[in-house]
């Protein structure tokens, strides 16, 4: 087994931003149509790779809410900006740790980000609920 670099994780929860936006929607300061704009690729990735949520959609109240994860990194090349399952992301993180053993976070490709997006398959509500940045070290 190859040596791997310890990884540093910085997690930004966007739950407060989500709550603020939903409050504005309920107060009619933001149009419902403006938050029901999931792209076809986001919906498709949520259908195939998304994990079901226990909570209902905050807009249509159906239990069709999924969490889908997208990975981004120069290190990934063409695979950057793609949706992945939790298992696939774990494998990417393992490969990333091996590839960056002995490197420093200042290298341009030594950062990987994971975006977790909440998506409703019914009404197309979507919101970036979590942003995680992973670096060696």
Question: What are the roles of these predicted feature ranges?
Answer:
Residues 1-112, 125-137:
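N-terminal pre-domain and mature-chain start segments
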């Amino acid at each position: 087994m190859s040596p791997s670099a310890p990884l540093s994780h910085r997690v930004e929860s966007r739950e407060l931003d989500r709550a603020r936006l939903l409050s504005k929607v309920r107060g009619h300061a933001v149009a419902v149509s403006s938050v029901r704009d999931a792209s076809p690729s986001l919906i498709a990735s949520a259908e195939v790779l998304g994990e079901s949520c226990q909570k209902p959609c905050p807009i249509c109240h159906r239990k069709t809410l999924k969490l889908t994860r997208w990975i981004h990194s120069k290190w990934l090349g063409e695979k950057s900006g793609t949706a992945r399952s939790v298992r696939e992301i774990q494998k990417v993180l393992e490969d990333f740790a091996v590839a960056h053993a002995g490197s420093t976070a200042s290298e341009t490709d030594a950062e990987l980000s994971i975006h977790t997006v909440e998506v409703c398959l019914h009404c197309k509500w979507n919101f970036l609920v979590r942003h995680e940045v992973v670096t060696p070290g």
